[in-house]
Amino acid sequence: FAKRYVELVIVA
């Protein structure tokens, strides 16, 4: 689940 969060943070 960390990978999904990391991707969201990068997009943010």
Swiss-Prot record:
Contains 3 disulfide bonds. Its main location: secreted. Binds 1 zinc ion per subunit. Its cofactor is Zn(2+). One of its GO terms (molecular function) is metal ion binding. GO terms for biological process: proteolysis. Snake venom metalloproteinase that impairs hemostasis in the envenomed animal. Monomer. The molecular weight was determined to be 21,390 Da. This is Snake venom metalloproteinase. It comes from Crotalus molossus nigrescens (Black-tailed rattlesnake).
